[in-house]
Amino acid sequence: LTPPLILVTGATGYIASRLIPRLLDSGYRVRALARNPRRLYGRAWFDQIDVVQADVTLPHTLPAALEGVHTAYYLVHNMAQGRGYTALELESARAFASAAEQAGVEHIIYLGGLADPEQHLAPHMRSRIETGRVLRGGKVPVTEFRAGVIAGSGSISFEMIRFMTELFPVVPGPAWLKNKSQPIAIQNVIDYLLAALTNPNGRGGVFEIGGLQTYTYADLMLRYARARGLKRRMFLLPGIPVWFMALGVALMTPVPYPIAYALIGGLSADSVVKHPEALQAFPEVKLIDFDAAVRDALQRTHPDHIERVWLDGRPGAKSLKHEGCFILHLDTYLGEGVGVREFRQIRFGSLWLERGSRSHTLFFSPSGLPGFLYWYLLYPFHWLWLRWRGKRP
């Protein structure tokens, strides 16, 4: 029998990048929906999937993407749009639910945010809850998972914790650092998303998912610091405006300002599991604790594991912050040679240089504040050095 076709929306995002390989390993056919398919070119699994260019904010692009689809994963958000994104998210969800119904899709699986709908919520968290409600308003059965902080290399919330903890020996923070969170390992999020495909107990339900324990946000940062061997102290500084925190996060982490602003605003309420029905509905999911998830994330801060999001088929030099590393990429066009990786452990962090026949890529994983200062102070020299190496066969 031909395996069912699974559509993954938000294919260039973090969750999709971890879900798609697991779907392929499980024998499913996968179609990836992306506004810009070029951003998928460098993924190891690109040649194993069907890629369709579409946009959930443009309803006329959806019928072709949904044709022949058995189950669709709804993994998109519009926080990067900035002002007005919440209305756009609801309109997109409504259009997607309608298009899925017309295409004969049998199941929608949605990953939303973990929060108490009865509390006063920031726009980001309220929108996540309302998006699920809109999807469930259609005729296609919807399984909704609500998750808080996702612990894994590349997760937006985890990268905020990582970079802020690495950067500041004394971490200032607003009062919401005392709020509670129940983080869940990325492996377990994917376990739940996969289990929903075949487990009939979950079809049509809303499930709050979290890890084994509850922590304050300050605890999460201190536990990360302990895993990294960093000494960190926290102090609360009430009255720090959200825009100021978001600006700092955007400057020092891979998270863009509009997303940082929305996420930080969402930290004003607790994010804990109050209804643990997922544990009974999906007993096949074995939960991993936060410390183990952090250790796994740190092990993935290595070129062997980092998603090549910068390989989009477009020539030119690229600079980015991604999955715990600063990355410089330069096309070389030497036309010959075999890829070589050089590694150097320095006082301020870990350096890797990948030398290929067509490009050179420098990875730097900083160790604490000295690592950040080293990178930024010597940033122009890193480019000069990489260009010099790029001219050598």
Question: What kind of region is each of these model predictions?
Answer:
Residues T2-L5, A195-A262, D270-L334:
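Mid/C-terminal beta-alpha module of Rossmann-like enzyme folds, strongest
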Residues P3-Y28:
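N-terminal Rossmann NAD(P)H-binding glycine-rich loop of SDR-like oxidoreductase domains
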Residues R38-A103, G113-P117:
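NAD(P)H-binding glycine-rich loop region in Rossmannoid oxidoreductase-like domains
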Residues N78-L167:
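Glycine-/Pro-rich loop/turn segments that contact NAD(P) or position catalytic residues
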Residues S92, I156-S157, W176-L197, G205:
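Substrate-positioning beta->alpha
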Residues G148-G154, A175-I186, G210-Q213, E284:
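Glycine-rich "substrate-gating" loop/helix at the edge of Rossmann-like oxidoreductase active sites
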Residues F348-P380:
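Beta-strand/loop substructures that line and gate deep hydrophobic ligand-binding cavities in soluble
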Residues Y374-P393:
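A conserved amphipathic terminal alpha-helix motif
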